[in-house]
């Protein structure tokens, strides 16, 4: 679950995961921390980042900085998605589909953080396979990035939006 939720520069910042990792050397283990964060404006722009440092706060600040640099724009249909989306990253597979008004965000931990930061308020989502937070966030991003609006599809095909939607 996303732990920290702060607003900075109009951006919603969410901490998805913090892990302790170890580097094994001759004299023993050197511990450090990795942080996974999601940043979004709640209006179709969202980014994620990973940071690693010897202390947790430093790892989180590095991850937030990386997330601000790694932002994408998502074509939303009001408060939901344009169409159902499948995506995968590693062994994680995600499925997201638009939902009617009032449904809410029905999604698991890491996916929920990304969708809420992007400004999606009504969606049905499911994660299959690996539930590793980093892979789920990556797969969710791939799905959101590959989603296209009817206007873009119509422009590519040289047709009107009415012809595309039937």
Swiss-Prot record:
It holds the Pfam family Ribosomal_S5. GO terms for biological process: translation. Residues 11-74 form the S5 DRBM domain. GO terms for cellular component: small ribosomal subunit. Keywords: Ribonucleoprotein, Ribosomal protein, RNA-binding, rRNA-binding. It comes from the Bacteria. GO terms for molecular function: rRNA binding; structural constituent of ribosome. Belongs to the universal ribosomal protein uS5 family. Part of the 30S ribosomal subunit. Contacts proteins S4 and S8. With S4 and S12 plays an important role in translational accuracy. Located at the back of the 30S subunit body where it stabilizes the conformation of the head with respect to the body. NCBIfam families: rpsE_bact. The N-terminal domain interacts with the head of the 30S subunit; the C-terminal domain interacts with the body and contacts protein S4. The interaction surface between S4 and S5 is involved in control of translational fidelity. This is Small ribosomal subunit protein uS5.
